[in-house]
Amino acid sequence: MVLSRDGDRTVLTMGSDFKGEPSEFALVVPVPTVLERDQIHVGDPKIVEHLDAYSAPRLVEYFDADPCMMAKYEAMTRNVAPAAGVLEDAVSRAKALGVTIEASYTVGEYDILILSAKQSNGLETWLNENHYRVPPGASRVLGSYLKQGMKFFVAKVNLKEQAKTGFKNLRPLQMAYESPKFMLPIRLGMVNADGPQELFVYALTRDGRVETTNYRTVKIPSDAEIPEYVKEVFADFYRDMFRTAVRKEDNTAVFLEYAWDMGWCDPCASEPLSRDELRELGVFWLDESQPGANRRISGAGTMPFVTRLHLRYDAAHFPEDLVFQQTADRSNFQGRYILRHPWTGADDCSAAQEYRKSLRGRREKQATTLAALTGWNLEDIRTRMHVRGDWSTETDSVKWYQKLWKK
C-alpha cells in the first residue's frame, strides 16, 4: 500500500500479490466517502516496484585494507608528508589527499563509495583521478558541504542491463480522496484470512516520517555486522530476522524499515523516484513549474519524505485498523546490514599478525549477532563460515612457501 498524503488529501495505491486466475480476484476496501469516477485510477506496478526497491533493506560491504601498508603509511606520515603517487593502493592514495573511503559496496546497478574529506581540493583531485567527472572549480562548492560535516556519496554506473519484464501481476488500483482520518482499513481483510498476513505501507508525506498511533512503531534491527556468506542467502536472513523481531515484540508492533528524504539516499538500493513517478503515486504537491520536471527531484521544499512500514498481522493481535500520524521527524533510518571482507594478503608484518588474531573475535561476534537476529543455530552458522573451533580459518596464517618470494 502506498499512501501519499498532505493535509486531508490522500491518494491510496493498492498493490496486489494475487496469484490466482484474474476472474477469481476480489478486493473490498472501506473508503471515507463516495468516490467519483475521476477519483479512481489504474496505476503502473513498476512504479510501486521501484518504490519498494528504493526503500528495501540493504547490504553494504566493506573491504579491509592491507594492515602492513597502512602501518607503513602511518609511519611515513609521522616523518614526512608523502608526495602524490607514493602509494599505489587506492585507500592510501585517498588518504594522501586527505580523503577517507568510509564505505565501498555494489548495490544494484551502481558501484558506490562513501567519502569523507579534510580539504575540498584534495577531494576534487581524487574524484577527477578516479574518473568521477566534476566541473572545474568545484572545490568551493565541495568545501561548503565539508564545513557542514557532510559525507559524499559517489557512484559509477554498472552497465549490465536489467531484464525487461511485462505485467505478470495485477496492476495496482488507486483512489484519491479527502478525509481528516489518516488511516488504513485492515480488519476486513482478516475475516477470511488463512493465518497472519504481511503488509508493507509506503507513506509519502511533505513534512516527516509517519508512525502508527494505535500500535507501537518499532525500528527494525539495523547496522548489524554479519558473516560474509549471508550475501548469498540475504532473502532467507531477512525473512527469519523479521520473524524473530515480530516474536520479540509479541506480534503487536509495526516495524519501521526505511525513513528518508526522497531527494537522496545513502546507500541507494535503487535510484530515487522521478517527479513523474511520484506524481503517479499521488504526490500532488510537487511544484510542476520547477524546470527539469522529468529529472530526479532536487532542491528543497517539495521533496516527499518516504516512510516504509512493515507488519505481520492477524485479528488476535491487530484488532483495530491502522491509524497514522505524520510527524516533523525527518531523521534518516534504514534497514542496513554490514558485510566486512577481511584482507587476505600474504604479508606477515607485525600489524598483519595482530590483524589476523583480531579476526577470530570479529567472526565470533558476527556469528552470535546473526544467531540472535534470526534464531539460526550457532553451530550451523559456524559450519557455513568454515571456521575452526577457535574461530580461525585457513587464511589466518601465512603458508611457508608464501614467505619465500615476497613481492
Per-range role (PLM):
Residues 35, 41-107, 290-292, 298:
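A cross-kingdom signal targeting lumenal/periplasmic-facing segments of multi-pass membrane
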Residues 74, 78-163:
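Long alpha-helical, hydrophobic tracts
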Residues 2-67, 123-144, 149:
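Surface-exposed, glycine/proline- and aromatic-rich loop segments on solvent-exposed faces
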Residues 16-18, 31, 116-119, 159, ...:
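A mature extracytoplasmic/lumenal domain signature
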Residues 1, 134-369, 373, 377-383, ...:
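Accessory, solvent-exposed terminal regions and/or long lumenal/extracellular loops of proteins
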Residues 9-11, 22, 107-111, 150, ...:
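Coil-to-beta-strand transition motifs
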